[in-house]
Amino acid sequence: AEGKEVVVIPSKTVPQGIATLLVMDPDADVETNVAAMTEAMSGVSTAEVTYAARDSDFGGFAIKHGDHMALLNGKLFDTQKSLEKLLKKLVKEDTFQNAEFINIYYGEDVKESEAEKTLKLFTAACPKAEITLLSGGQPVYYYMISAE
């Protein structure tokens, strides 16, 4: 827009970007918004759950095509043949155990009934957190899970 100052907030994950948008105040000045948005983003950890498209060795893991993988804050967390086992291991991480808010975005390849099971898993394992399940509709990633 002509006459408007545009600032890019360098988020690294979709949940970080969402957190920045939630605190933006259209009535505040640019500096105030940048500070608030950057702070909001810094408090977000992200897990991304997907599958291996090919065999590979990465980060000490021998990954086979079709294995389920979890990335936590951009680093390979674990791989498992079973998605359920991977999620059970992921939910035990301090990132989620110490979270106040957890948002679970499920992808286009996840049935709502399966997403509900994942919600129950996180709700049982993280009783102190407020947990929200959302249809993200994202391709490739079964889940994107944010913890704040």
Please give the residue ranges for each predicted region.
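N-terminal loops that bind phosphate or other acidic moieties
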Residues: 1-148
